[in-house]
Amino acid sequence: SVSSPDEFFQSGGMKTTAENYPTVETSRQLLMAQARAKVNHFAHTRKLTRTDDQPVVRMNRDTYYSFAVVDVSGGATITLPAVPEGKYISVQPVTEDHRIQPMSYGSGTYQLATHYGKHLYLIVRLDSTFSEEEANALQDAMVIDAGSAEPFRAEPVDKETFVAVENSLRQKLGELVATYGGNVNEG
């Protein structure tokens, strides 16, 4: 297994299929996030998200983001700081097999757990009406408490099949939107 995005694509690696693509792409995203900030630590976007710099698909442009890969194998929590009434803060966990867990809204300490693997990818969103200074102070007040700090590891992947499947799925996107409209991501 590998712990770096630079090692992810290898000849002889696991073949990507349409069925395993969500998990394979999630592994790639976890490795890239872990390269930006070590496990159980945040990588914060200190400015509102630009349309030309989106590490994940369809990020909101009116949101400050913080990302973390958390080892939950020894138990873990995230604490979000207090925000004024009417302001927005949330955390969304994503499992290693790309299951989007229920979001938690507002300040508080939240338990982190997964049904699959040992790690979660956390996406924390902050209201765009905060000034950069306010948002950065809130980001710095976020706390991850984890009983283990093992880095995420993934099986190496064959790049040729990964690219072919990804391109095939992208080509089908127009068809899916035409069929399902705004609900293309549901179900």
Q: What would you call each of these model-derived segments?
A:
Residues 2-187:
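A compositional/structural signature for long, glycine/proline-rich flexible linkers
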